[in-house]
Regions:
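Autoprocessing Asn-cyclization modules and mimics
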Residues: 76-198, 203, 290-291, 296
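Exposed beta-sheet edge/beta-hairpin loop segments within beta-rich domains
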Residues: 1, 139-143, 259-266
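Sparse recognition of residues in long alpha-helices and their boundaries
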Residues: 26-28, 166, 288
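Ordered hydrophobic segments in well-structured contexts
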Residues: 66-68, 152-154, 174, 271-275, ...
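Protruding loop/beta-arch "assembly-hinge" segments enriched in small, turn-prone residues
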Residues: 83-120, 202-204, 208-296
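Alpha-helical scaffold segments in soluble metabolic enzymes
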Residues: 10, 49, 80
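Active-site glycine-rich loop that binds ribose-phosphate moieties when present
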Residues: 44-52, 134
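Long, contiguous amphipathic alpha-helices that act as assembly "spine/axial" helices in icosahedral shell
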Residues: 1-40, 46, 55-73, 96-110, ...
Length: 296
């Protein structure tokens, strides 16, 4: 028991924390929806607008919606919400733990491992291309520096549409960079102006202006509002080796962790190793929305 508490439990905590951090880094950069003003504490209205984004892209309206937010901005939200109506259970949690309870149809989670995004180069460039249906690459006028993977942008006048009715929304469709040079942007979702996968009201044109979210070379914590089915995380049971001093495998809360211990005759010690075989992916990135906060 003492060995487990002193050695195993701290090691597992670090391992799981690193996995969670890498997952947020990866899946957040696949999310193209964004609301709010980067660098400022998100307002309650902006959180509601993030929730509205999920509604507009047909995320289920159930109890599986969540917001992950780092501690500094969470403290600001607790202060902003303190005078508003909550039931007694949520008020006691807010007072006792200093966190926001379930409100606005979202479960609020304080998390220091959310992704912090640093915006890339120029935040406004022009298309130097004739975009076609299905394109996920755009040639642009030479920028002074390349955009960063995870940068979000809009194209002037290109509106998003309802996924089913295809009626144009009032806001411009947002896209996220998956690769970039100073003259080429690769992004998702692709440009679809017709058919079942239509996501924009019309194709952009040469010289249309592309505008990035945020200020160049500036880092912002990316709070994440999402439905749980937006992302997938999976672990698999690793094979149990034979002929070792000790081997064990445990499953807890969706994680499968293997511990192997073996005597090292050369160094006269018994090293242990912990392994988790895991993977993650944004399956429905439209069911999530980034809110770039201040973190200060």
């Amino acid at each position: 028991d003492d060995f487990s508490k002193r050695i195993i439990e701290p090691a597992v905590a670090v391992l799981v924390s690193n996995i969670e951090s890498s997952m947020f880094d990866s899946v957040t950069k696949e999310v193209y929806n964004h609301v709010g003003t980067p660098g400022t504490l998100p307002t309650i209205l902006e959180i509601a607008q993030a929730k509205a984004k999920l509604n507009q892209y047909l995320a289920p309206k159930d109890d599986n919606r969540c917001i992950q937010m780092e501690s500094v901005d969470m403290a600001g939200e607790v202060n902003a919400l303190k005078g508003l109506f909550h039931d007694s259970k949520e008020i006691s949690k807010q007072y006792r733990d200093g966190v926001v309870g379930r409100t606005m149809g979202l479960k609020w989670v304080e998390n220091e491992r959310i992704y912090t995004h640093t915006v890339g180069g120029d935040v406004a460039v022009a298309i130097n291309d004739t975009p076609a249906e299905g394109d996920s690459n755009l040639t642009i006028d030479a920028a002074s520096a390349a955009a960063a993977v995870g940068d979000i942008f809009t194209i002037a006048g290109v509106k998003a549409v309802h996924p089913e009715t295809k009626v144009a929304y009032s806001h411009e469709q947002q896209f996220v960079i998956s690769a970039a040079t100073t003259t080429l942007l690769t992004f998702t979702p692709s440009l679809e102006a017709s058919g079942a996968n239509q996501n924009i009201d019309h194709l952009p044109s040469d010289n249309d202006v592309i505008t990035m979210v945020g200020t160049a070379s500036t880092a912002y914590p990316n709070h994440l509002v999402y439905h749980k089915n937006a992302f997938a995380f999976a672990t698999a049971d690793l094979e149990m080796p034979q002929g070792v001093h000790f081997a064990a495998r445990e499953q807890y809360d969706g994680l499968s962790i293997r511990l192997v211990r073996q005597y090292d005759i050369n160094n006269d010690n018994i090293p242990c190793r912990l392994d988790i075989l895991h993977g993650y992916k944004a399956l429905r990135p439209e069911w999530a929305c980034r809110v770039m906060g201040s973190g200060s």
